[in-house]
Amino acid sequence: MCRILGAVSAEPISIEHELLSAENPLIVQSEDHDSGWGMAVYRQADSEQPELVRFPEAAYSDGEFRRATSMRGRIFNAHLRRATLGGLTLVNTHPFVMGEYSFSHNGTVIRYPKLIEDGCAPPQGETDSEHMFNWLMCHFDSDHPRKSLRKLAEKCIRCSAFSGLNFLFSDGEKLYAYKLGIFELHWLVRPGQALVSSEIITPDEGWHTVQQDVLMVLDPNNPENPHAERLVGDELVAAAEIDKFEEGQHLRGDARGKFAAERAARVAAGSAE
C-alpha cells in the first residue's frame, strides 16, 4: 500500500530526478500515498549510520521533501507511506533505523503482534513494519544478512496473513530488496548505478520486474551486476495467506490516519480481522 525506492551508486549521487522530475517521480506518487515520507541516505556505504529524514506529512505538500532531494549518497532507502496500521505520527513513518541498519516496507501484515518476543526492542509506534524490523534486528546475524532476511520472511508467512512483504533493507554496505505479495517491484541498471522501485519511474528506460519471492542484492561497489535469488521457496510461498485487505482503500489524509490508528488498536487488542 506504500511506495519504496532504493538506489546504489559507485559514486555519491542525488536521486533528485527520480524524486521530483522524472515522468513518474515519487512526489507525484505521494498524491495517493499521503501518510508520510522518509529517506535514509548512506553517504559512503562503509557501514556508517545513515542520514535519516522523515515526516508524517504528504511529500507533495511538504517543503522538507524538496529540500531533502539534494542529499547525496551511495545507498538510498526511500519510502512513501499509505497508512494501513498505525496513525500519522513520526514514529510510524518509514524508514526505520537502528544503528547502521535501515528498513522500509510495502504491505500489511495483519497479525503483527505475533512478531513481539521477549528480548527484542519494543516498538516506538504501532506499525506492522516496525515490528518486522525489530524482529529482524533481534535475530540478525551480520555475517549472514540474507539468511536473516529469509528467517524474517518465513516468520511473517507462518504467523500472519499479509498483502505484501515487499521491503528495502540496508546494512550500510549493500541494499536488499524483496518482493512477495500483491504489490509490484521493479529494478533498473544504469552505468554505475542500480535502482529498485515499486513503480516504473522512467518508462523510457529498461526496467525489469522482480518476480515473487525474489531477493535482490544491490552492491554500490558493483552496481551494474545485482544478485537475485529465491528466498523462501515454492512450498512456503504456496502456504502463504495473501490477502488484499481492501477495507479503507478510499480514504486519504487525516481520515486514513484515523482509520489506520483505530485498526492498529483493534489488532493490538486481539481482534485482528
List each model region and its residues.
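A short, Trp-centered hydrophobic/proline-enriched beta-strand micro-motif
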Residues: 38, 75-79, 166
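Short, compositionally biased leader-like segments
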Residues: 8-10, 42-44, 49-78, 132-135, ...
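Short histidine
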Residues: 110-171
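Extreme N-terminus nucleophile/cap motif
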Residues: 1-57, 177, 194, 213-215, ...
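Conserved catalytic micro-motifs used in adenylation/nucleotidyl-transfer and phosphoryl/amide-
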Residues: 2, 92-110, 154-216
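Short helix/loop capping segments that flank catalytic or ligand/cofactor-binding pockets
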Residues: 15-16, 50-52, 86-88, 105, ...
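Cytosolic regulatory regions built on CNB/CRP/Popeye-like sensor folds
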Residues: 48-56, 100, 111-121, 273
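Short acidic (Asp/Glu) patches
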Residues: 55-67, 78-99, 115-117
